Amino acid sequence: MAERFPLRPITPDEFGAYCEVPSQAFNDTEFPAEGIEQERVVFEFDRSIAAFDGDAIVGTAAAYSFQLTVPGGIVSAGGVTFVSVLPTHRRRGILSAMMRHQLADIAARGEAVAALFASESVIYGRYGYGSASTELQLTVRRGEGALRAAVAGDAGAGSGTGAASGTGGGSGAGGGPVRLRAGWPAELRTELAKVYDSVVPHRPGMMARDERWWQNLLADPEFRRRGMSRQKCLLAGDDSGPRGYALYRTKPDWGEDGLPFGRLWIGELMATDAAASATLWTDLLTRDLIGRASCRERV
């Protein structure tokens, strides 16, 4: 295996060809040029692994250097990504060779954890991985969901109109009424980071973000929208500063009855206290013209 499909890191000039392999392996559309350039912002070329068949890249794996919150503290972690093998080269030991190579590198770097989001979790048990958490995708149709009474009480009676009026409902850790402000993520970058950095140390599974990762998250190229709107931001706070935020997208739609039934996708919702969280959720779940709100991860 090692002689037939040698492994090595890629150079920046090889990144385009490298990105084509996971696109084919995951049956995805072609990796757009703007996506390749955006990924370069965070990609760590010295942590890349490519398996070659002659001059062609046939397998890929990579890792990001993270600080990961676990119960009891924060540890260095390798965020495993880009794991793929071309359909034409499956079952030839390429994946196993890349995994062994990568795990040895993670250990040599002194990282305590190797973590990844698995498309097929059963694959990775062979290499020592185990399930650390589960992923929930949630869709709430308008009128079919509600916050628990105790949580809804934190949001206050007026939070449902907070985005329009600039005022929210309840109070919480900040000590004052929660107010909502609608805006664009890039304009609120400082406030978003303040909330996120406050949450990270207290929530296992969270990964600290540096400037590169904020740039990657807030970039809004067309291919990420998937037919929905620009990424929008809803900020919750009081006189003491920001206490929460939601990043989301919308898409107008109409039901068979001719009534509005738009979609709202929550990409990330973070809050430092229950009142701010409840105020954000209440606003997003009661938007006019929205028939269903969905979320997955990072909420």
Predicted regions and their residues:
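Acyl-donor binding region in acyl/amide transferases
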Residues: 77, 85-113, 117-118, 126, ...
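Acetyl-CoA-dependent GNAT
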Residues: 44-47, 52-73, 81, 248-254
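Intrinsically disordered, low-complexity, positively biased terminal segments
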Residues: 1-16, 30, 53, 70, ...
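Conserved catalytic-core motifs of GNAT/GCN5-like acyltransferases
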Residues: 117, 130-148
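An N-terminus-focused feature that recognizes amino-terminal "leader" regions
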Residues: 32-38
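A short helix-loop-beta-strand connector motif used in the catalytic cores of GNAT acetyltransferases and
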Residues: 40-59, 79, 134-135, 218-234
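Ligand-binding pocket scaffold of soluble enzyme catalytic domains
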Residues: 7-30, 41, 46-48, 59-63
